[in-house]
Amino acid sequence: MVYLLAIIALLITFILVPVLIPTLKRMKFGQSIREEGPQSHMKKTGTPTMGGLTFLISIIITSILAIIFIDNSNPIILLLFVTIGFGLIGFIDDYIIVVKKNNQGLTSKQKFLAQIAIAVIFFILSQVFNLTDFSTGIHIPFINFEIPLSIAYVIFIVFWQVGFSNAVNLTDGLDGLATGLSIIGFVMYAIMAYFQGATSIGLFCIIMIFALLGFLPFNLNPAKVFMGDTGSLALGGIFATISIMLNQELSLLFIGFVFVAETLSVMIQVTSFKLTGKRIFKMSPLHHHFELVGWNETKVVTVFWTVGLITGLIGLWIGVS
């Protein structure tokens, strides 16, 4: 069953992308590029965005099949809820930017409130309706200790889901970067879930891996399509949720290390400029800094993937120790 669902996830995405690209072009759903960004990016203007729809559709269809045919599908129901919720926020944001020609998209407040709502509903579904049995404390690796939070854990869920959904969104600025890092991350969590005996979560990770593998060939440099906020916000929300459901929250700091580094680079840049009027990096997020240093896009992506693989293995080691 696992192999069949993996193949279905791969094929749905791989078939949908070539169908969607001309449709997006015809509807002029193209990406706008920041003028102050690297000049090499200007050629990307008009590249179809919202491509994340393809792998989200694949994930939804394949997950529904899994829910129908496997036992103990409650974790998949929860993960599917988060996928659809964060994906919908991203879709609305993309729609406003691309169709309504409003580069701001949803306001930060609107996004934050929507993300809070999803996090709270996730907590209620998991704890009140007992759809899964993860603890409401933060697990500390190696010392077999947990910081109990009880009902306050919902605050952590909000912070974790919102933080990582936006972290993946910030990272999705180079062809194939966020897609490749996400594949690496879900491989690590699939293995971790296997060691924990969390078969449903492991199956969902495998579905994610193969759905993204179907998208990757079209997203590599030169990208024929971008995932947009539709894809990136969903991926970040899923990563946070899986780490929570496996009670391995802190492992995500390593498995998602590049996402964290990209986010910190933006925070450091903004803080430094406000306090001193000086910038630490040539440009943020971090991948743009390396481009302006002289690295070509493919080199940046390859190096970041390599870093993601190394830190991902460290995160896996932490998660299974």
From Swiss-Prot:
It comes from the Bacteria. The chain crosses the membrane at residues 1-21, 50-70, 76-96, 112-132, 140-160, 173-193, 198-218, 225-245, 250-270, 300-320. The gene is mraY. It is a multi-pass membrane protein. GO terms for cellular component: plasma membrane. Pfam families: Glycos_transf_4 (PF00953). Catalyzes the initial step of the lipid cycle reactions in the biosynthesis of the cell wall peptidoglycan: transfers peptidoglycan precursor phospho-MurNAc-pentapeptide from UDP-MurNAc-pentapeptide onto the lipid carrier undecaprenyl phosphate, yielding undecaprenyl-pyrophosphoryl-MurNAc-pentapeptide, known as lipid I. It is an enzyme of class 2 (transferase). One of its GO terms (molecular function) is metal ion binding. This is Phospho-N-acetylmuramoyl-pentapeptide-transferase. It catalyses: UDP-N-acetyl-alpha-D-muramoyl-L-alanyl-gamma-D-glutamyl-L-lysyl-D-alanyl-D-alanine + di-trans,octa-cis-undecaprenyl phosphate = Mur2Ac(oyl-L-Ala-gamma-D-Glu-L-Lys-D-Ala-D-Ala)-di-trans,octa-cis-undecaprenyl diphosphate + UMP. Its cofactor is Mg(2+). The keyword Nucleotidyltransferase does not apply. Its EC number is 2.7.8.13.
